[in-house]
């Protein structure tokens, strides 16, 4: 069993892009300073909790309508498409949940994990699905909130969801865009994207936990790769360094795993919700866990999974764990650095999940607001 963890360093292949990013950042006009969020007595950001409540109600109302039109029957755990306002669609596949043995980097780090049912996006999120979120139609503060003079003019709550400020340079790093995975967002940006998609669709979305991601990747297998142990088959399923990839690729060109998910190995790294801890069994303090999630307590490191197009076969295994690091923002001259972009990661993306059970308002709030992003 391969157990691999790595702090990924800045790619040496893009020095000119890094220089452009720095130059563009210096030239960019200064945005309005951030306003410290108002915290309620329970510690929640008042504006973000208001939004969470509004989206939670929207989701419950939509589910009630769907149930009524389905003669009172509950929604089935089957594949479906979720259209976005931009015209892009999310292809979602069911994962019935279940149990698996979760092995860590250390010999004694073995957990028996059970997971509730969920849906996961069939492919990595593409630019077509992500860019309308990234390119906000209204001016924003560095924290992604609308500028004060705009707030009274906003008619739709979706514009109160924090969204990225303009990027310094096209985040494709000189590679192709159409049909390709969205790149270089921070975990905070990925969380806010999930909130934005939830508002649009009436379905609750979030990043997968590390356990959910690995369970979906393994697709019932207990080997390092979803296709088995034959290294000669790797090129049929994955874009990776050993396959001579020189750039990221349009998702869905390789073979899927047994559950129908594409590019779980290679192409781009994918965000999870979890803070990185070296020993998960030690963290949870027990042998069996249900729906495990290591909630963030600091900006770094978080866990990314799947490996990317530059990495070795070992680094794209189902068990491999990769840690986010401040080095990913080394080309950002802002102080504090951007909440939204990693300026040196032309191999970092995301896919998203929809749990079968709708969470509470408080749970939604915590999934979308890690509470540590301001320190990045």
Regions found by a protein language model. Give the residues of each.
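Functional-site microenvironments in short loops/helix caps that host divalent-cation chemistry
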Residues: 101, 167-327
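Bacterial N-terminal signal peptides
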Residues: 15-24
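Mature N-terminal segment immediately following signal peptide/propeptide cleavage
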Residues: 86-101
């Amino acid at each position: 069993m391969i157990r691999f963890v790595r702090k990924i360093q800045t790619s040496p292949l893009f020095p000119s892009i890094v220089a452009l990013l720095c130059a563009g950042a210096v030239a960019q006009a200064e945005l309005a300073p951030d306003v410290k969020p108002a915290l309620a007595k329970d510690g929640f950001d008042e504006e973000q909790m208001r939004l969470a409540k509004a989206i939670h109600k929207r989701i419950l109302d939509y589910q009630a309508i769907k149930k009524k039109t389905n003669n009172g029957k509950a929604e089935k755990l089957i594949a479906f498409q979720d259209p976005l306002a931009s015209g892009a669609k999310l292809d979602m596949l069911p994962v019935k949940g279940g149990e698996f043995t979760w092995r860590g980097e250390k010999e004694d780090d073995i957990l028996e994990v059970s997971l509730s049912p969920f849906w996961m996006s069939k492919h990595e999120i593409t630019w077509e699905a992500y860019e309308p979120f990234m390119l906000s139609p209204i001016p924003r503060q560095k924290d992604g909130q609308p500028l004060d003079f705009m707030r009274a003019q906003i008619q739709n709550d979706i514009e109160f969801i924090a969204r990225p400020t303009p990027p310094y340079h096209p985040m494709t790093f000189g590679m192709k865009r159409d049909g390709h995975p969205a790149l270089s967002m921070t975990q905070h940006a990925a969380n806010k994207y999930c909130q934005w998609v939830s508002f649009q669709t009436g379905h609750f979305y979030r990043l997968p936990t590390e356990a959910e991601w690995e369970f979906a990747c393994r697709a019932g297998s207990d080997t390092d790769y979803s296709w088995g142990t034959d290294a000669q088959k790797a090129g049929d399923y994955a874009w990776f360094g050993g396959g001579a990839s020189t750039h990221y690729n349009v998702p869905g060109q390789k073979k899927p795993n047994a559950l129908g998910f594409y590019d779980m190995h290679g192409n781009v790294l994918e965000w999870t919700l979890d803070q990185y801890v070296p020993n998960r069994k030690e963290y949870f303090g027990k042998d069996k866990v249900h729906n495990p999630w290591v909630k963030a307590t600091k900006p770094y490191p978080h866990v990314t999974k799947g490996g990317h197009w530059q990495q070795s076969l070992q680094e794209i295994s189902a068990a491999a764990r990769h840690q986010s690091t401040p080095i990913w923002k080394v080309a950002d001259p802002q102080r504090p650095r951007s909440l939204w972009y990693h300026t040196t990661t032309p191999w970092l993306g995301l896919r998203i999940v929809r749990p079968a059970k709708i969470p509470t308002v408080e749970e939604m709030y915590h999934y979308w607001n890690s509470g540590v992003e301001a320190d990045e």
